[in-house]
Amino acid sequence: MMEKVTKLALTSRVMVLVVQLLANFATPDHKPDVFRMPQSEGPKKNGPFPWLDELVLQSLSGLRHWDGEYFLHIASNLYTYENTLAFYPLYPVVVRHVAQACQHLGIPLSRDALILLVAVALNVLIFCKTANVLYKLTQRMFNDHNKSWNAALIFCFNPASIFFSAAYSETFFAFASFSLMLECMRSEKDFRTFRLGAALTGCFVCRSNGLLTLGFPLYFLARHILLSTGSVQRCWQLFKMGLAMLVALGILHTYYFYIYRLYCLPDVKVQHAQHVVDYAKERSFLISGQASVGSPWCGYTLPFPYTYVQSHYWDVGFLRYYKWKQLPNFLLALPMLLFMHWHCYDYIRKLVANTWSKISPSEYQGILKEHISFPFVLHAAVLTLVCTLYVHIQVSTRLLASATPVFYWFAADYMPNTFQLSFRSKAGVLFIWCLTYSLVGTVLFSNNYPWT
């Protein structure tokens, strides 16, 4: 079955790549006044085969727009501008080091072409692995091969599909999140401390909302304690789980200190390429290594830049996006938000109704064993609420599609047990929505138009 899921995932990625290629060549790009990775005005540094560089850059140019420009800039230059601090390091740093390794191996491409190629290739590879992890996670949760397959199917053609192939961190985050959830659900004899720690660290350093995934090991740690019999081996496993969480938090704060050092310590000086400095002056960006200029977040009690950067550069905050001019973006995000709000509410309502009368010291163990999906739905409900109230509403679809398996589980419940899908059924409407958003989103995104 894993081979079948991999083929499905790879097929969906090839389809996205082909559609973006055709759309990018057929339609001229929109040119919004947004961040573009600064390029040197000097002679272009081509590889030994300039035509090969041009082929890669032209063929994949539709996958570098919007936030992709930030990720590629970080992969090439690291955190040179303060506004790049909105993007966490896992994806761009991995791309950077893999591209450097490819250069050392003699791959005949320029640095820019190689970084773009690696960024896309890694996402395709990790996407296939993520589809398999989602299948395993669903199977472990429900023990239903049909539902597991349908969840993987919907994931492969999800409504935010383009963002899982473009130079975005969605694929890496989905892989880290689903892997963490799978590790948390393993039995004690199958528990692997390193895997849990690595997955949790991946969540923390991939996206800001990755911090919410700390709730999973905490929940399952508490669950193990409440259900434990007190054996020495079990206590040792719980200790290792706690240690893995502490190590992951330590690595996250190492990144925070690195950023604080770059932007807040006056004795740190950073040499930048001239075109990077010129672009900063043109856009009035605060550049790293200039602590004398200063930034307000450096003086915070907990000097974490993310909230300040999002508020200052993108006007992100409670209900700030509720403006009439943003109505089209609200309409784009509406299907995902309505779907998630309703199903999370319905699940929690039924859970409360079924367990309210059972809440007692003698019954809590049975409740914990029976409702193992509760932390997953609660996590999804919190994310959906955050999307509705705080973030730029158009990112809701891709944020939820990459952060929680619950969307795919709820959607899989509508799918038939056979391949006979009626487009007039709820399953048909759901699949049409996914395919339409996947297709239209790929066409619009690849031509630099806004998309959800």
Curated annotation (Swiss-Prot):
A GO CC term attached to the entry: endoplasmic reticulum membrane
Biological processes, Gene Ontology terms: GPI anchor biosynthetic process
Record keywords, A-Z: Endoplasmic reticulum, Glycosyltransferase, GPI-anchor biosynthesis, Membrane, Transferase, Transmembrane, Transmembrane helix
GO molecular function: alpha-1,6-mannosyltransferase activity; glycolipid mannosyltransferase activity
Bilayer topology: Multi-pass membrane protein
Intracellular or extracellular location(s): Endoplasmic reticulum membrane
Lumenal topological segments: 29-113, 183-209, 260-284, 349-370, 420-426
Pfam hit, one: Mannosyl_trans2
Entry annotated with the keyword Endoplasmic reticulum: yes
Pathway(s) of this molecule: Glycolipid biosynthesis; glycosylphosphatidylinositol-anchor biosynthesis
Group of enzyme by EC: transferase
Main location: endoplasmic reticulum
UniProt-listed Enzyme Commission number(s): 2.4.1.-
Cytoplasmic side: 1-7, 135-161, 231-238, 306-327, 392-398, 448-452
Keyword Metal-binding tagged: no
Membrane-crossing residue ranges in chain numbering: 8-28, 114-134, 162-182, 210-230, 239-259, 285-305, 328-348, 371-391, 399-419, 427-447
Sequence similarity: Belongs to the PIGV family.
Purpose: Mannosyltransferase involved in glycosylphosphatidylinositol-anchor biosynthesis. Transfers the second mannose to the glycosylphosphatidylinositol during GPI precursor assembly. Required for the GPI-mediated endoplasmic reticulum exit and proper targeting to the cell surface of chp. Required for GPI-mediated membrane attachment of chp, qsm and Cont. Essential for microvillar stability in the rhabdomere.
Cited PANTHER family: GPI MANNOSYLTRANSFERASE 2
Protein name as catalogued: GPI mannosyltransferase 2
Species assigned in the record: Drosophila pseudoobscura pseudoobscura
Taxonomic placement: Eukaryota, Metazoa, Ecdysozoa, Arthropoda, Hexapoda
